[in-house]
A protein has these predicted regions:
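Generic, well-ordered alpha-helical scaffold segments in large soluble proteins
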Residues: 42, 63-70, 92, 96, ...
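A general structural motif at alpha-helix termini
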Residues: 60-61, 217, 273-275, 362, ...
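Alpha-helix capping and helix-loop boundary segments enriched in small/acidic/polar residues
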Residues: 105, 110-113, 157-164, 168, ...
């Protein structure tokens, strides 16, 4: 039977134990391999300050690499009676190496241990989100360029308003993602700071070398003040949640548009039948369930910052068990967002557009502004031109000129997609993921 790291000479009530452990054993599986990475950096530093012998370090690192491989394959489990991944890793080391395995916790608390686990996990997941956003972005830019000359109605108040184009529609969401990437970058920069060495939130009497662990783990810098490092629990999750919610907001709006444009009353876009679902009673149905679920999941993700804030917003300085509950909403959110991004990219790639929407005369009035502008350009006062065209429409005499010429930046005839791509590339170049990746490879080699 495994012993708890904090166990003394009394037994905790089983119901209290069940309630306080909660879902920790399950959720910590997300963090297991990152716990190993943190331990590898920590013990390397311990050896450098004389708290471990060189041969002890070599044996511990070798065994930690074995545990990492198990976790990386998804085979890591917390044994019965083990509270969390920290305890399980220490138990596995002790089972293999005896008392040597008990030395890895010197100068460390589970508080800074889980902080570093969360940061290592989160920065890895943020990179995967960034990669998925870029794939969707590229699909949108490609579609925007492909259909840049195909007009569609633009709407205000859900009323036909002015000419738009598929180039503008696809490109608008691409630029939205380029802006969202700035939020992801800010979240990554705030995440990629080392809390290790803050212990329970008040530091340690051991002469820890925090600069060394910062470099070993590929962090950009550290959370310098040990009290602030602990205060960062919850704050980091909230900041990342805001960035994820921003991406989700773009996805939700795009999914709503796609559902609406796909319905028979609009008929602007068509989804391949293999990307739709059917009805058990209506044989003609081809439902856009993928976009409906992207919309629902993305709307759910937009509540994530509020969920995190409501757990942490009335906590004073220091660690509290309340913070464990954040894991329940935070850790699974990455897979949900990645899934939505991947599905959106896949279905956007397959989407077909109706290139003859404007053959329908019901869209003729949206060219009225073009006519007003032409009359004004020819010298008629704008208000007189507006009234003249309005009266023609009311009398059923308006004859649209559908040959439009928009040339300013960001308009139908000048999408500026190359500028939008430059925005995205600039932001991507400033993440510097290679620092993280190289550090982790170096630890594991």
């Amino acid at each position: 039977m495994a012993h708890k790291l904090w166990e003394k000479n009394f037994e905790v009530n089983k119901e209290i134990e069940r309630f306080t452990v909660g879902r920790d054993r399950e959720l910590d599986l997300y963090l297991a391999k990152y716990d190993v990475l943190g331990s590898m950096a920590h013990i390397t530093m311990l050896e450098s300050i004389g708290l471990l012998e060189k041969d002890e370090l070599a044996q511990l690192l070798a065994e930690l690499k074995n545990i990492y491989a198990i976790a990386d394959k998804g085979e890591f489990v917390n044994e019965d009676g083990v509270e969390d991944d920290h305890s399980q890793v220490e138990l596995m080391l002790t089972q293999k190496l005896g008392d040597m395995g008990k030395k890895i916790h010197s100068g460390r608390s589970r508080n800074d241990q889980v902080l570093v686990d969360l940061k290592l996990f989160t920065r890895h997941e943020l990179k995967e989100i960034v990669d998925a956003v870029k794939i969707l972005f590229d699909e949108l830019i490609q579609k925007s360029n492909q259909y840049k000359d195909v007009l569609m109605p633009g709407y205000t108040h859900l009323q036909v308003a002015m000419p738009s184009s598929f180039g503008l529609w696809f490109g608008a969401y691409a630029e939205g993602l380029a802006d969202d990437m700035l939020f992801l970058q800010a979240a990554y920069r705030m995440t990629n700071r080392n809390p290790l060495g803050s212990a329970a939130g008040y530091g340690s009497s051991f002469p820890l070398n925090r600069t060394m662990t910062t470099e070993l783990l590929g962090f950009d810098s550290m959370d310098y003040n040990v009290v602030y490092a602990q205060m960062g629990r919850g704050k980091m999750e909230r900041n990342v949640a805001f960035a994820m919610a921003t991406v989700a907001g773009t996805l939700a709006k795009m999914a709503f548009d796609a559902c609406m444009f796909n319905c028979q009353n609009f008929g602007f876009v068509k989804l391949p039948k293999e990307c739709t679902t059917g009805s058990s009673i209506m044989p003609h149905k081809k439902n856009p369930d993928v976009f409906e679920l992207i919309r629902a999941k993305s709307n759910k993700l937009q509540s994530l910052p509020q969920q995190v804030m409501l757990i942490m917003n009335n906590l004073p300085v220091g660690y509290f068990r309340d913070l464990q509950i954040i894991k329940e909403v935070f850790l699974p959110a990455f897979d949900e967002l990645k899934d939505c991004l991947q599905m959106a990219a896949y279905i956007i790639n397959k989407m077909e557009v109706n290139e003859h929407i404007l053959d329908d005369p019901r869209y003729d009035p949206m060219f009225s502004v073009e006519e007003v502008n032409q009359l004004a350009a020819n010298g008629m006062p704008f208000r007189d031109a507006y009234k003249t065209v309005g009266l023609e429409i009311e009398a059923g005499e308006f004859k649209p000129n559908k040959d439009i010429h928009h040339t300013h930046e960001g308009s139908i005839g000048n999408l500026c997609n190359e500028k939008i791509q430059e925005l995205m590339e600039k932001t991507l170049s400033e993440f510097h993921f290679e620092r993280m990746e190289n550090a982790e490879k170096e630890l594991l080699k």
